[in-house]
């Protein structure tokens, strides 16, 4: 078994082994010279190992052989004549064998070769080739790694195109930055290709396709919330169209515009259509006319200009309703007498003692009885005075508005004196007071009707 193994070993190794075991005096010098020769040759030696030497199983066999030979050396050492020379030669041989073994350890770690101190020199010859190839491979790996790391660095810094991952810039293919996400795109890489006009215009703020989609979605989301309460507003508007809801709103507007006493009991529609029966008239007049009477007294004390304004407003307000035909001629005749006969100027000049006199009859006007008697007197006047409006116009009638004493002259004086005697006996108000108040009320009612119609038209629109 040992002979077969010896045939496969290196001849230089066998020669050195023979010198080691020899008992001659020159063996140590020859061994040293052989070691120097082998070191000088090194890789350039003519010996080339076969594949058998490199294979791991045969390496293990050589190891077993060297293990067998070691006891032989130890046994032969005491028998030698020159022990010191042999020991030095043995040390040199071991050092020479350890040097290539150390080199092979570094190279053969990747090939799973068991580590042993004694390995052949042929393996050291094959090792530089493997080292060179590994160097070449490592250089290639480093260059590729540098390229990839540069690309990654450019991508991390945001210097390269997001689509093609390159930093190249041409005349018609420049890098454009999205102002929202700050990604760079080539003009050709971006799906809707970016035109040169968009790139060169400094005023333009460019967004990529993804950001534009997101911004559109956000805009739609922000527009939707204000659209949701819109149906609630629409649902409120049909309730306004309801006639029951209209009335309080229009009444509030009337109170604020005319600045009368704030009473929600005022129902001008019932007052207008209330002359069909005397009971309805009296009940409506007591509640509604008390506030308007005080307001009319204030306006009548201002002078004849207010009467003229009321007559003008009454003429321009619109058509009279059929249900209120009994009252309206009274107001018209009263206004005609006051405007044509110039009675307002007479009242202001001769009959009124002081400007504070018209305020005195206000407390009795608020009583319910006075309202009843006034409504009755108005009905009497309307019944009596309707056939003779022409006689009232030319006839000069002198009337006192403040003191409560009244006297009428003219062809129809006997008919109107009855009504005035009733009113003067029951209250301190004159006949002129109710007729002027009625005319003002009629004018105000017509204005209210016109305003109601205008408000209804607006709501319908």
Curated annotation (Swiss-Prot):
Positions carrying Phosphoserine: 127
GO cellular component, one term: INTAC complex
Cell compartment(s), UniProt: Nucleus
Reported modifications of this chain: Dephosphorylated at Ser-127 by the PNUTS-PP1 complex, promoting RNA polymerase II transcription pause-release.
Segments for region (Disordered): 42-131, 302-443
Gene Ontology MF annotations: zinc ion binding
Low complexity compositional bias, start-end: 348-357, 381-436
Gene3D superfamilies named among the record's database cross-references: Zinc/RING finger domain, C3HC4 (zinc finger)
Compositionally biased intervals (Polar residues): 302-328
Alphabetical UniProt keywords: Isopeptide bond, Metal-binding, Nucleus, Phosphoprotein, Ubl conjugation, Zinc, Zinc-finger
GO terms classed as biological process: RNA polymerase II transcription initiation surveillance; snRNA processing
Zinc finger residue ranges, PHD-type: 158-214
Chief place of localization: nucleus
Basic and acidic residues composition bias: residue spans: 88-124
Domain of life: Eukaryota
PANTHER family: INTEGRATOR COMPLEX SUBUNIT 12, NUCLEAR FACTOR-RELATED
Description of how the protein assembles with itself and partners: Component of the Integrator complex, composed of core subunits INTS1, INTS2, INTS3, INTS4, INTS5, INTS6, INTS7, INTS8, INTS9/RC74, INTS10, INTS11/CPSF3L, INTS12, INTS13, INTS14 and INTS15. The core complex associates with protein phosphatase 2A subunits PPP2CA and PPP2R1A, to form the Integrator-PP2A (INTAC) complex.
Name of the protein in question: Integrator complex subunit 12
Species in which this protein is naturally found: Mus musculus
